[in-house]
């Protein structure tokens, strides 16, 4: 089974994260940031991933370090779980509607870290979650996993719905990208490596 477990401890956070790419029954998220827990649960559910996250952070300051560091560890686990990347689709994309909002995510498991984020999040805070941290999370994942990730809110009016559409689209796009494909021999690149 393609999986990874990692711990990252700094003076600001302690993150324990387990990711299973081929098993979706075990999802448990506890970051201390309720809205972020909800988004990670949606990501795992719609991507059909097993995901367990325990995070302790300096949320008395704000949620920035916790959200960013969870993104870093998730990216590291994704990179490790993919092993040599042989036989995977490599590319994945998904549009997801959430009521009046529409989100889009495209992924290339390229070995090159790059993130493009486009979306106007008009409500600056949802619970304890600063909505600008949505972009920080996606940037952290893309950088740590060495993937190219485009996340875009096409339209919408409700900030919660916009972010929810992105996390669901992220799960669905990543599922497509990591899926094994019997028609692909080796890695899906003319270079012979990713």
From Swiss-Prot:
One of its GO terms (biological process) is L-histidine biosynthetic process. Pathway: Amino-acid biosynthesis; L-histidine biosynthesis; L-histidine from 5-phospho-alpha-D-ribose 1-diphosphate: step 6/9. It is found in: Cytoplasm. The keyword Signal does not apply. InterPro entries: IGPD_sf, ImidazoleglycerolP_deHydtase, ImidazoleglycerP_deHydtase_CS, Ribosomal_Su5_D2-typ_SF. Gene3D superfamilies: Imidazole glycerol phosphate dehydratase, domain 1. Keywords: Amino-acid biosynthesis, Cytoplasm, Histidine biosynthesis, Lyase. PROSITE patterns: IGP_DEHYDRATASE_1 (PS00954), IGP_DEHYDRATASE_2 (PS00955). It catalyses: D-erythro-1-(imidazol-4-yl)glycerol 3-phosphate = 3-(imidazol-4-yl)-2-oxopropyl phosphate + H2O. CDD domains: IGPD. Its EC number is 4.2.1.19. It comes from the Bacteria. Belongs to the imidazoleglycerol-phosphate dehydratase family. This is Imidazoleglycerol-phosphate dehydratase. It comes from Bacillus cereus (strain B4264). The gene is hisB.
């Amino acid at each position: 089974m393609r999986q990874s477990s990692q711990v990252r401890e700094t003076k600001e956070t302690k993150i324990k994260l387990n990711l299973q790419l081929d098993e979706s029954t075990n999802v448990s998220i506890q970051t201390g940031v309720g809205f972020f827990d909800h988004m990670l649960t949606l990501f795992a559910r719609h991507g059909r991933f097993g995901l367990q996250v325990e995070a302790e952070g300096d949320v008395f300051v704000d949620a920035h370090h916790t959200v960013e560091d969870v993104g870093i560890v998730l990216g590291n686990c994704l990179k490790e779980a993919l092993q040599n990347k042989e036989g995977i689709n490599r590319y994945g994309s998904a549009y997801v509607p959430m009521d009046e909002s529409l989100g889009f995510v495209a992924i290339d498991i390229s070995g090159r870290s790059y993130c493009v984020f486009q979306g106007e999040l008009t409500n600056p805070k949802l619970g304890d979650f600063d909505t600008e941290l949505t972009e920080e999370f996606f940037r952290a994942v893309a950088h740590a996993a060495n993937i190219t990730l485009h996340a875009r809110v096409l339209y919408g009016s409700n900030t919660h719905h916009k972010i929810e559409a992105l996390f669901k689209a992220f799960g669905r796009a990543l599922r497509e990208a990591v899926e094994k494909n019997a028609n692909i021999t080796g890695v899906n690149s003319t270079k012979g490596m990713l």
